[in-house]
Amino acid sequence: MADRHVLATPKTERAALVGLTTGAGRRIDADHSLDELAGLADAAGAVVVLRVLQERPKPDPATFIGSGKATSLAAACAEARVDVVIFDNELTPAQLRQLEERLERKVIDRTQLILDIFARRARTREGKWQVELAQLKYLLPRLVGAGTALSRLGGGIGTRGPGETKLETDRRRIRTRIQAVQREIDHVRHRRAQLRERRQKRSVPTVSLVGYTNAGKTTLFNRLTHEHAVASDALFVTLDPLLRQVRLPDRRELLVSDTVGFIDRLPHALVAAFRATLEEVAEADLALHVIDAGAPERDRQMAAVRRVLEEVGASEVPVLDVYNKIDTLTPDERRRLEDRDPAAALISARTGERIDALVEMVASRLALDTRRVTIAFDTHNAFDREQIARLYRVARVVSHVAGNGRVVIEADVPRRYIARLTTPALPEEGIDAR
């Protein structure tokens, strides 16, 4: 596509987007990727005034887009009064230096832009630590020769002197800070592991919402839990994990968690830093993969989510695909989607359409890992009374017969909970699992 200009309002950073395609057949994909980059730039508070898509067999080691294209890009940026040039790929430290010299303006890449958005969105201490760790790990190998704006990380100009001496100081301070932040995150991981262990002892199943950013996960979370978490038509609104209790129609309880949205080429440093959060997905009993049913790049987005799930060790978690925003589809588009993926759920979290059917599907999927048991309780025993109440929370009770101070309950119980159902009062004859 040709380079194009749009008008921008004042008092915002004016951005140029630059992409590269290695062949004519991939131009459409590269253009879609630039569209996504424009959304990221908007989320970061910039306004896009210039788009450039360069075609060449492979990236140039020095300037990524080639010397001639860098020269023409510099002229276009000057004409459009560009403040920041954003590349749709991760640039090497050498390419960043060359481009800043050639373009004479700030240059960042896709990774740095995503990190900036995460930094803006983080609200809790945990979220801020995770973003900071990712930013510092990204910055560390890019310090040599960067030469600008490092004083705010190194304690101010003059702490050690100019040039390489100051950069070495920055590097040492950053390594020290990385270690400190990592310790805080390790503490968070340990605390989360303890909380998961407690939940597992209660045997309340956990369902995690995962999906591409802006697929509607938080809107679905609000619909399922009757909460009012912030949901917006914007990227990466949810960074800090949310966990709420939900009661199924058969009276069983489950926990629903909302997680950070994924994106294609999610920076590895960010995935690593958010591992404490994403481990919640790896430990879930079921993952609901929320998909924007009307997204032009739907298949690519689905593949990106699956890659991140593999990276965080969640590839073995059962997944139910949930196509959201079906209110934006035509009847024919709905039918084609149902024919293509008959095992999936089709819903509209915004309107509430088919939410009840989704809840039934979740209950059914969770029931696959249950076993029918019959167990007798002594109603005079405090421990047994507590077990009865817990059984109603975690299992689907089929029958309840009471008499002579005893209660006999037949229920479909999660397999991992059965071993804990033998009561002290009735160690042998009290349970019949079949």
Question: Where does each model-flagged region fall?
Answer:
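N-terminal accessory targeting/assembly segments
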Residues: 1-115, 430-434
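C-terminal-of-GTPase-core extension/linker across diverse P-loop GTPases
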Residues: 1-18, 22, 29, 38, ...
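Switch I (effector-binding) loop of TRAFAC-class P-loop GTPase G-domains
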Residues: 2-3, 190-192, 196-205, 223-255, ...
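Flexible beta-alpha connector loops of hexameric P-loop NTPases
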Residues: 24-29, 58-63, 121-126, 165-166, ...
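Conserved C-terminal guanine-recognition region of P-loop GTPase G domains, centered on the G4
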Residues: 26, 33-43, 47, 70, ...
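Short, acidic/turn-prone active-site loops that include or flank metal/cofactor-
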Residues: 111-115, 235-236, 349-351
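Short alpha-helix plus adjacent loop in nuclease-associated cores
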Residues: 112-131
